[in-house]
């Protein structure tokens, strides 16, 4: 029966009655990315006599032999003020296998990517430019590989540039090594005039894509400002998300409705210029903006788990939604 396929027992009269139950597998929630978080099995929402309750399911230990659920390094690196954040456990071998399609040196990364990883979106940035934080625990030789992969694979074809791509700038900032490349894009954050070599860009806008590594922390974003802010958070010169996130329990999710509403509002208005898309612009103003205004009035929340250790398959863990 379907209950057994989700690790659930048959309902009986003796058990606490469940009026409604929604169970979603990670195969659906992952949108094809579930292989990146093999420890995640699914989510469940139940309505009983005392209201709604939610649960998160883990796969068995074989799906994530060396996954880490310690997300403290992620929250230490993320600058405060995020609109939405998610942290996930990393399992060895997943990223290395993916990198094998773009680099012959992926085998040298084995065991170097470690711990948890996280993504955060910020209201003053863009929807397509979140900040990624990961953990790198490799040798001195392996520490050179992220920069090589960045140089080989990050960029756009710039036919006006002598080498067909704009150069990568590599700088040292304190203990951090930083790689940056300007990349043409019609959706870029900066106008062409602000580029180091504007005559070589193929678009009127560009991203200043950045990768940084400081000690064991990897930072990446299409928005260079977010990487700079994260370095400041690491160096204790800017507040970090760890100052906001509760320290008791495991926190894989942070939601700031006010920041989310502002980010979505900015993205909507940017993609629907009033003079070019008057019909959709008016529809957004009438139907979407009131809902975003209502969203912005909601409190901030974190998803909190008391413990998170893979055991048997479909291990259901109760979720606490804690307001901040």
Predicted region positions:
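Leucine-rich, highly hydrophobic segment in Treponema pallidum outer-membrane-associated proteins
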Residues: 1-100, 116-119, 202-206, 210, ...
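C-terminal/domain-terminus segments
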Residues: 105-107, 236-242, 322-324
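Well-ordered, non-membrane alpha-helical segments in soluble/globular domains
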Residues: 67-68, 102-110, 146-154
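Single conserved position on a long alpha-helix in the C-terminal lobe of the eukaryotic protein kinase
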Residues: 1-4, 115-246
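C-terminal low-complexity, acidic/polar tails when present
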Residues: 98-126
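Beta-strand-rich interaction surfaces with strong enrichment in secreted/lumenal proteins
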Residues: 74-75, 108, 168-170
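Short amphipathic alpha-helix segments
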Residues: 29, 102-109, 190-199
